[in-house]
């Protein structure tokens, strides 16, 4: 799978390599650093990788920063020569901000076990707390939600193409900000005025813009294991992204726990192909 390898190894050697590169923060995401909000998803992924190296010392893992469109097309052509034909930019790739975590199976193949992304959209809470009005005339409490978050669908679709021969789909997306509130709540401005964030407001909420990636299944759940659904006379295997949404920032510990659960689900599903002895 083409793409730059950031970390690679097994057991203690992998842990030491990550510590040397990133310091001790990622190593403590299940402890002292669990409540931090300032660790990037790249650092959280590195911390999850150290935990995997600790729990599965005989398995070799690697973290890639990207997956090229060329590699995706090669995989598609291996399924059917009619697929994977269109490529205009040789260097085209997807680069999930949490990277692509893989494990080497007993046949020497690298298998994707975790892909993570973290997106923020909607700064209304921060603006209200600061007493800043928004809009062109600077007379509104809220800014109409944008559509930037919809770009995540491209990465999800590309990874689906790459993993059509797998029984798992370990794509995790953490969405945060006022555009992803799952319940209504109140925020007080510095002047004492109380503003209500309404979670089902069409002006603010953008969760419905992303649930196509999860076939509108419930949010905040691990959907790593694919499901087979009967539609008419056809059976379809669905690859469903695991979407985690809330208005407040996700802590490093919350992201790490969800990502570790997805990675371990992947390892369980492909266990027969792994050499853990």
Swiss-Prot record:
Protein name (database record):
Type II restriction enzyme RsrI
Q: What class of enzyme is it?
A: hydrolase
InterPro entries associated with the record: Restrct_endonuc-II-like (IPR011335), Restrct_endonuc_II_EcoRI (IPR004221), Restrct_endonuc_II_EcoRI/MunI (IPR011336), Restrct_endonuc_II_EcoRI_Pbac (IPR018131)
A Pfam match: EcoRI
Please list the cofactors this protein needs: Mg(2+)
Q: What lineage is on file?
A: Bacteria, Pseudomonadati, Pseudomonadota, Alphaproteobacteria, Rhodobacterales
* Swiss-Prot/TrEMBL catalytic activity: Endonucleolytic cleavage of DNA to give specific double-stranded fragments with terminal 5'-phosphates
A molecular function (GO) term: magnesium ion binding
Task: Output the GO biological process annotations, alphabetical, semicolon-separated.
Answer: DNA restriction-modification system
> Which EC number(s) does the record attach to this protein?
3.1.21.4
**Annotated keywords:** Endonuclease, Hydrolase, Magnesium, Nuclease, Restriction system
Task: Give the record's subunit note.
Answer: Homodimer.
Could you list the residue ranges that cross the membrane? none
Family of the protein in this entry: Belongs to the EcoRI type II restriction endonuclease family.
What species is given as this protein's source?
Cereibacter sphaeroides (Rhodobacter sphaeroides)
């Amino acid at each position: 799978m083409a793409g730059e390898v950031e970390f690679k190894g097994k057991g203690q050697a992998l842990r030491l390599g990550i510590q040397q590169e990133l310091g001790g923060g990622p190593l403590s995401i299940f402890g002292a650093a669990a409540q931090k909000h300032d660790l990037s998803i790249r650092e959280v992924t590195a911390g999850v990788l150290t935990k995997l190296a600790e729990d599965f010392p005989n398995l070799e893992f690697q973290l890639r920063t990207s997956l090229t469109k060329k590699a995706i097309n090669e995989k598609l052509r291996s399924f059917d020569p009619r697929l994977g034909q269109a490529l205009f930019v040789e260097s085209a790739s997807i680069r999930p901000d949490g990277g692509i975590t893989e494990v080497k199976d007993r046949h020497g193949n690298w298998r994707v076990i975790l892909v993570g992304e973290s997106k923020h959209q909607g700064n209304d809470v921060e603006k209200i707390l600061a007493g800043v009005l928004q809009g062109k005339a600077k007379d509104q409490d809220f800014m109409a939600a944008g559509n930037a978050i919809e770009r995540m669908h491209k990465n999800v679709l590309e990874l689906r193409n790459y993993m059509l021969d797998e029984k798992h789909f370990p794509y995790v997306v953490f969405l945060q900000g006022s555009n992803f509130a799952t319940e209504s709540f109140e925020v007080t401005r510095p002047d004492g005025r109380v503003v209500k964030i309404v979670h089902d407001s069409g002006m603010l909420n953008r969760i419905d813009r992303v649930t196509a990636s999860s076939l509108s299944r419930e949010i905040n759940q691990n959907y790593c294991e694919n499901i087979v659904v009967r539609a008419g006379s056809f059976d379809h295997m669905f690859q469903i992204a695991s979407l985690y949404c809330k208005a407040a920032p996700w802590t490093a510990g919350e992201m790490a726990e969800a990502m570790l659960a997805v990675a371990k689900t992947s390892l369980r599903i492909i266990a027969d192909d792994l050499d853990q002895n």
